[in-house]
Amino acid sequence: MKSQIVIFIALVMLGACSGPANSGITQQPTLADYQVGEKWVWKYKGVTTEGEVRSDGEETREIVSVNGVLGMTIGNDTIPVTDIVKPDESETPKYDWPLEVGKKWKYENNWTSQDGTTGNQSQDAEVLSYQEETVAAGTFMAYTIKYTGKTSNSRGYSANEEEVWLYAPAIKNFIKLTQNQGEFSYAEELIDYSKPK
C-alpha cells in the first residue's frame, strides 16, 4: 500500500502548480518557481478499520542541484524538476490545468508496484473550494480537490475509494491528504515547509 501511495504522491508532484492569478485560476509552474534548498516535510499514518497501523512516519523532499540541474529528492530518488513541471498530455490527468473552483474531470492511473502487482485507479475529480486551510506547518490558501472512484489490482483486490487533497499553490505542493480505501484509512499532513531566505 505504501508503494502505491509513494507512486501516487510522485504523480501529484508532477502536477505542482504556481499561485493563482486574480481570476482565481492556477496555472502549472515553471522551472524558475523552484529554488535549491526548498524543503517539505510530511507526517503520515495508515490504519485499518481494525486499528492495525500499516504505515507511520515522516517523508522529506528537498530541491537540490546535481551538476547544475535542479532535482527533487523523493526517498532515495532524485527527480529532475523539468520532469515535475512538464505538462501532462493525458486525457485523464491527475490535475486538469488550469485549476479553478468547480472544475471536474476524470482521472485514471495504471500502475505496477515494486513486487510486480499491477493495478488501476479510476476516479472522478472535482475542485470544491479555494480558501485558507491550517495544518501543522501553518496556514495556506489551498484548493480542496476531491477524488472518488475505485481501485483494483491483479491480486483480486478491489475497493471504493475517496481522497481529499488540500493543495497550496504558494508552496507548489499538497498540505494534507486523507484517503479512505475499503478497510484502510491514510492521512498525510505537512508539518514543515522552508526555503532559503
Could you say what each language-model-derived stretch is?
Residues W105-Y107:
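Short Pro-Gly-centered flexible turn/kink motifs
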